[in-house]
């Protein structure tokens, strides 16, 4: 069995000695206070005892103006009942997969904890998946149980489930764990109707149960399961799927636990702090930084079934007591939306009405880049945003900018305790690193750009059923197992890495490398531009051409205040010719995923279809 000391990082690396390593943060993960690699359920128990939080509210669930508070002891009781039902009634055993197709809710937390109680593998599924996407996810993991909202069941998974290994569907409703009664409950019911009476007791090829009834009728049992945290998966999560269909990342108990303890001293996480759960739990960012942070480190998770409007978010925060402070775990889209709301009513008026700005200790950005045109106004109104870098395959966090003391904006930060990173040739990993972070390598700076590779105990077990993908993305070097991230960047003399772009997003214009992120950042400085997305399109003359999709700030109109030719000229005046967009299309809004990432592929595919049909590209 591995030990944390097996992941020792050479303390000669420049990030330890360049003047930016945060004071008081151990250089090695094995030196972090109270670090212990246990099965998830054991970790939950240890945390509850260590901080004596059994009778503390650790889950705060918001439905409109209603707030439901749940004590940790209650969560354990509910989870043990759910796990007992899975084990006794359904025969679910260690290694079996339970798919959870739910929004952030008490329901999700109970289902997830119940899986960890019996050693089942929890698979998070996006509730907005269409039938074919659901079929693909369930087929890849061979899930045996599907937990889903009653409204989604009514929408019709019947065409999909008979083609899978699912033998049981557990239907639930957002009000299943709400304790309100009388008029308050009825008001909630008016907004969140129940479809349980329309859910059948069984279908032709699977049984159907109701989660609320399961909890009411099941007596919890003590179930002991032998789990090796280093080799047994705790969760299956779908990766972003930048090309083709998404893959399934297998994350072990040790992957998830080690990542939490990497972040803890760096971000100064303390039990009792509130972490805002707007990021979905089927995504590794929300799973680790919100739910697992609460259950394994003693934080309080503030849950919304969908990202709230900014007035609701601000009003909710104002109602809550937060003596330990609040962490806003979010993505650029949510930060921008909050800034836009403050500016719409005026900063002075906002701060009279709400106290969010006083309670927010810091904000953490992940799941994509953070542009200065969002960061600067947010930090002026609220607090510093610290950017984290990671992937689903790394549970997810690899690095974060230092929270206190000197730092560098626009960088990916420094690797967390226990994480090592290096820059390798993007087309020849076996040649060894271009820059490994030792002073001797001395290959620092933009001229030594390559693929960012990381190693540490947080790196996934592998891709489920994808042997070639696994071999292409997980490779051994110098006795360590490295993940090839697919991201292109370079390291500076202090160990900070600057991300240039995704390897697959790189645009080649007449032999020049164009990084979409750089063009987006430059165009974002235009006074009329609100958001911009950049991608490459095939071009007969130059190989590829740059296209930008642009939304304008409120009060500006395309073709009246500015047109594409005027904006192209501005770009040519402010960046190299080969970087300047050949096409600029104004759009009303950007397509975004539930995690707030702009879906460049969705924009690009419309034009690829036009090219294939011989039609003219807009812009």
Predicted segments with their positions:
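N-lobe entry segment of adenylate-forming
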Residues: 1-70, 74-89, 94, 163, ...
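Conserved AMP-binding A3 loop
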Residues: 69-73, 226, 234-258
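AMP-binding/adenylate-forming catalytic core of the ANL superfamily
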Residues: 129, 136, 146-148, 456, ...
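Gly/Ser/Thr-rich phosphate-binding loop
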Residues: 169, 317-318, 325-330, 340-407, ...
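AMP-binding/adenylate-forming catalytic domain of the ANL superfamily
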Residues: 172, 575-598, 616-619
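Conserved pre-ATP/AMP-binding loop-to-beta segment of ANL
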Residues: 189-238, 245, 268-274
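Conserved AMP-binding/adenylation subdomain of ANL enzymes
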Residues: 257-274, 282-327, 336-337, 341-350
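Conserved ATP/PPi-binding loop(s) of AMP-dependent carboxylate-activating enzymes
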Residues: 415-418, 428-476, 514
